């Protein structure tokens, strides 16, 4: 079948697309999900302890992103894709790590610098990009600024 790369996630804290459970529960796109047509059935609920509450497997990068959510407490949304930003002003990590490689956690954390940020956008060397924000509005602003047509966090009814 078709392979779909990249993923999206959100910290469940009363905003889309979660129902408020606890502050330590997250939604991740399921593995091999077409992100163009993502809906509620394509999301996998995962606890901060890495317990998965679905028959579907979450993204390979789930463990990496869970640790990034711990490192960056203000961050509530992340999108990771397998393309790159051409803008020279965007930082690029120095080392290549494949999907799900735990070494990428420190690489991203060090590249961002401060853990008290409300957003960050990085190119991941030979891997793609990651965008992380505190609010849906800030995510949409960054997506619009860089002319990305990624809208996985639309309202689900």
Each model region followed by its residue ranges:
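Glycine-rich flexible loops
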Residues: 1-157
């Amino acid at each position: 079948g078709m392979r779909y790369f990249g993923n999206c996630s959100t910290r469940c804290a009363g905003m889309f697309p979660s129902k408020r459970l606890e502050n330590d529960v997250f939604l991740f796109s399921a593995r091999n999900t077409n992100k163009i047509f993502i809906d509620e059935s394509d999301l996998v609920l995962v606890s901060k302890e890495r317990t998965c509450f679905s028959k579907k497997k979450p993204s390979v990068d789930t463990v990496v992103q869970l640790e990034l959510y711990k490192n960056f407490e203000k961050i509530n949304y992340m999108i990771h894709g397998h393309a790159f930003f051409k803008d020279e002003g965007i930082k690029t990590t120095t080392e290549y790590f494949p999907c799900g490689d735990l070494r990428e956690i420190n690489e991203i954390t060090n590249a961002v610098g401060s853990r008290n940020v409300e957003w960050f956008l990085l190119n991941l060397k030979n891997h793609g990009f990651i965008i992380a924000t505190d609010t849906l509005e800030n995510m949409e602003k960054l997506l619009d600024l860089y002319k990305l047509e990624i809208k996985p966090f639309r309202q689900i009814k």
